[in-house]
Amino acid sequence: MKCPNYTEDSTVLCHMEKTETDLGEVKGHKVSPRKTGALSLRSPAATNVSTPLESRSKGPHNKENYQNKRHSLDMASDDEVIFSGSGLTEDSGYLSLHNSQVDVDGLDSLERSEENCVSSQSLDVECHSGPCLPVLNFQEEACRELQRSYKKNRSYDWTVVDKVAENFGLHNVIGGKMGRQFVDILCKLMRKDMRHILARILGLLGDCDLISCTKVSRTWRKIICQDQLALQRWKKAEKTRRDSGRSMGSLSRDFTLDRVVFSCMQTVSSPPAHKAVKKPPCHMGGAQNATKSSRFQQYVEAAQSLKQHESLRRCSRCSSPARFDAVMQRAVCTRISCAFEFCTLCQSAFHDSTPCRNTVRSFSSTQKTLVAGSARSKRSIRRL
């Protein structure tokens, strides 16, 4: 017998034969005992040699390795069918050089397919790992541009940020107004031409709310006027409001009993209030007319707050109106700066129950009684 010469090709062929025997046992094919005996004889040097496929398929639970291994086993089973068809190869434990070259080419194709799969997976991971948010993309691009400007000029050119921001459309990013205390949502929706959202918001508002919205700003009024349904509701609500105001006014005035003015009762119940009267400055020319009109207004205002048992007198100091009490014969000036309290009998300061020092009572010319036989009495008799 000739001893086989074990080389690298023979080790590869033996490895492929081993896989064939395993598949034969699993699938139920018969394998000759001579082939198994030839496969069991191996040199120590051949056992240490390993192919690239063996070094790559260390992980049995790896899905990728499992698919490649299955593919190689299928190829080996096809070779087994070919070898079993020839009687020479079934009896002898050797393979031809042509078959070994075909198997090596198959291994090279498997290695290339594995490399392509790994490279495609790495590209997919890189594509998915990149950020899809425009804000993050803007930040990365701005950092790159700032880094380039710093390398050129040794200083950061912050104008680059505005130029980069124009290309990313950050004005359309949702949440750009977060953190602000006041945000005009209706104006923002109008600028973005979202009329369907505005129509839905206005449809949820009541009639009174629409009237209030028109009074907020011109922009809100314009938004309501652009929506036909909201505009009709607003006009109808305004008309209803005006009509209801008129009807309520007519009901309260026309169909109720005559009401008495309670100003007199209010003045009786309230304590006397001394109102400040501003004295107008005196000017040359129309000073007398101004004084007369202002004095008249003072007396009119003082008369409105009088009680039933009071009357008006002229103050002996400033000629302003004074409240007169007929029971006590006392008068108090209504002018705050004066506020003179005097006795109406002696025109001096009020002295309570003490008798007046000056008992001579001064009467005006209109209040003097006619004396019999006087010239005035004679004139009055002639007139009769």
From Swiss-Prot:
Keyword vocabulary terms for this entry: Cell cycle, Cell division, Cytoplasm, Metal-binding, Mitosis, Nucleus, Ubl conjugation pathway, Zinc, Zinc-finger
Binding site for Zn(2+) 2: C343, C346, H351, C356
Name of the protein this chain belongs to: F-box only protein 5
Effect of substituting D162N: In hrpx1; recesive allele that is lethal and induces a reduction of neurons number but with an increase of size. Induces rereplication and mitosis cessation
Annotated zinc fingers (ZBR-type), start-end: 311-359
Region Disordered, residue ranges: 25-67
Entry keyword annotation includes Cytoplasm: yes
GO term, biological process aspect, one: cell division
Organism annotation: Danio rerio
F-box domain segment(s): 187-234
One Gene Ontology molecular-function label: zinc ion binding
Polar residues composition bias: residue spans: 45-54
Record-listed Zn(2+) 1 binding positions: C315, C318, C333, C338
Pathway where this protein functions: Protein modification; protein ubiquitination
GO cellular component term of the entry, any: cytoplasm
Bias (Basic and acidic residues): 55-67
Record's subunit section: Part of a SCF (SKP1-cullin-F-box) protein ligase complex.
Classification via SUPFAM superfamilies: F-box domain (SSF81383), RING/U-box (SSF57850)
Function noted in UniProt: During embryonic development, regulates the integrity of the genome and therefore the cell cycle progression by preventing rereplication through an APC-Cdh1-dependent mechanism.
Amino-acid biosynthesis recorded as keyword: no
Record's subcellular location: Nucleus; Cytoplasm
